[in-house]
Amino acid sequence: MAERRKYGKKYCKYTEMKVDFIDYKNTELLKLSMSERGKIMPRRLTGNSKNAQEMVEKAIKRARHMALVPYIVDTKNITDSAYARSFY
């Protein structure tokens, strides 16, 4: 039987930074909980607390509605990373 991997304990970044409210205008803070394609990452991957995850989801949805953050990112047009260049 294969050994199980041991992962480090996940912690809430927002609780550690003592953030009381996550503002939709602070896009740098929102990018901590978004994937490179612009999707909202789930709690099991980010380690956010329930309260922080709900605030993040609301803030990202508001920022998308106000066009501060894109709904989706087209990775075909981005050739900055070495990973993207290796396939073309």
Curated annotation (Swiss-Prot):
Keywords: Ribonucleoprotein, Ribosomal protein, RNA-binding, rRNA-binding
Alphabetical list of Pfam families matching this protein: Ribosomal_S18 (PF01084)
Protein name from the UniProt record: Small ribosomal subunit protein bS18
Organism of this sequence: Aliarcobacter butzleri (strain RM4018)
Entry keyword Transmembrane helix: no
InterPro entries recorded: Ribosomal_bS18, Ribosomal_bS18_CS, Ribosomal_bS18_sf
Key word rRNA processing present: no
Gene Ontology molecular function terms on file: small ribosomal subunit rRNA binding; structural constituent of ribosome
GO biological process, one term: translation
Main function: Binds as a heterodimer with protein bS6 to the central domain of the 16S rRNA, where it helps stabilize the platform of the 30S subunit.
Lineage: Bacteria, Pseudomonadati, Campylobacterota, Epsilonproteobacteria, Campylobacterales
Ranges in coiled-coil conformation: none
Gene3D superfamilies referenced in this protein's UniProt entry, alphabetically: Ribosomal protein S18
CC terms in the record's Gene Ontology section: cytosolic small ribosomal subunit
Protein family membership: Belongs to the bacterial ribosomal protein bS18 family.
